[in-house]
């Protein structure tokens, strides 16, 4: 059977136009900031105005073709609601199945499962800062829960399903201080802006439950840091991983307003969004054992 050369050319042109249109389509991003636990100033609405972080994201979206939806309403989560987004960003806290601190509508158990299914099915997911302080294993109920001794344990495959999807979990933080982080993969989208090392004032989370397939992007240098919580081996602050068919990206930074103002943080976040949404490609091979072999050895619990 012979193909008509004109039809072949026409088909190629149409395919090219289709692919160009697809690549030119804005990434549809949900920025979800319900705080059932501690409510950070960068996500708080004051006098009905957008939050600090929402204003930063709005400016980024205008320059980089992102279609943003801002929400604190957990009751909206369903397969149909999540289907309209390419990337879901969580800057959240606490047990989102409870109304909690910000008094915004809670998620349902079915809504939480819809999120997990959406990511496993191919949606991009991004966790920022207290996105790792969300759905702690064995901690139910709203409010800013006290730090409990149980957080200083790795639960592995018994950890909450959300934590297993994210690839890590918040334990506690010490006093804000200037600290250094070593960049592991400068070729990953957004990381080139950091150079080979990041050094800033921030609230540095201690973390656990690192997944075996985490691809660490930068690692906190704990040597010389002040406070008992940092008397442990270096561990990742940011990573990328796959979860089912989905791409997951996390960055523990983002507590302070000046971090959100920092062009390096913005470039890093944009790279994460574009990678998670499939606009940019990069390998996310597991490397945590090689670059942070002691990461899952936790600090000693001290009340």
What are these model-derived regions, one by one?
Residues 1-9:
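Bacterial N-terminal signal peptides that target proteins for export
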Residues 9-20:
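Bacterial N-terminal signal peptides
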Residues 23, 28-32, 37-135:
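Helical hinge/lid and interdomain linker segments adjacent to catalytic or ligand-binding clefts
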Residues 25-27, 33, 53, 63, ...:
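Extracellular ligand-binding/catalytic regions of CAZymes and related secreted enzymes
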Residues 52-56, 110, 114, 161, ...:
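Extracytoplasmic/secreted proteins, especially bacterial periplasmic and envelope-associated proteins
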Residues 67-69, 215, 247:
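Conserved beta-strand segments of alpha/beta enzyme cores
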Residues 158-160, 164-244:
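Catalytic beta-strand/loop cores that center a nucleophilic Ser/Cys/Thr
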